[in-house]
C-alpha cells in the first residue's frame, strides 16, 4: 500500500521504495544512499522541518547496516503533524551515507553515535568522530559480528 508521501515522490520522479506503515500508521520509505541527500533537502522544503530522531542498526550478521530517520512536518494550526520514517541501507564493507547535518542540525550527535557504535561513515558531517567510545577503541560495538576485547572491569567490592 502506497502512502501519501510515496505517491508525491513518485509524481515528482524521486526514486524510493515504500516499506508500508508501522504499527502507528507512520509511512516508512527506503531511500538509496546516493539519493538520500537530495531527497532530504526536498523533504525539508516540502515541510518536514523537524528531525525527531536518527538511529542505526545492524540488520543481520554480515548483512546491511541501516540508518533510520524519523521526520515530522510541523505546521501552525495542525493538531496531528504528518510523520515519516526513512530507512537508508548501506553495505557493511563500506557503509557510507551522506550526512544530513546541513539540512537538520539536530542530527549532529545522533549521526556521530551511529558512526561510533556501528561504523557508518556520514560523508560531509563536519565533526564525525567517536562520541561515546575512546578514540583508540578498535571496532564497532553494536555490530552483530563484533567480538568484544578480552579484558575484565575492576569493580569496587563495597
Swiss-Prot record:
Taxon lineage: Eukaryota, Viridiplantae, Streptophyta, Embryophyta, Tracheophyta
GO BP: photosynthesis, light reaction
Organism from which the protein derives: Panax ginseng (Korean ginseng)
Encoding gene, per UniProt annotation: ndhJ
Assembly and interaction partners: NDH is composed of at least 16 different subunits, 5 of which are encoded in the nucleus.
Role description: NDH shuttles electrons from NAD(P)H:plastoquinone, via FMN and iron-sulfur (Fe-S) centers, to quinones in the photosynthetic chain and possibly in a chloroplast respiratory chain. The immediate electron acceptor for the enzyme in this species is believed to be plastoquinone. Couples the redox reaction to proton translocation, and thus conserves the redox energy in a proton gradient.
Listed EC numbers: 7.1.1.-
Family affiliation: Belongs to the complex I 30 kDa subunit family.
NCBIfam families: PRK12494.1
Name of protein: NAD(P)H-quinone oxidoreductase subunit J, chloroplastic
Catalytic activities: a plastoquinone + NADH + (n+1) H(+)(in) = a plastoquinol + NAD(+) + n H(+)(out); a plastoquinone + NADPH + (n+1) H(+)(in) = a plastoquinol + NADP(+) + n H(+)(out)
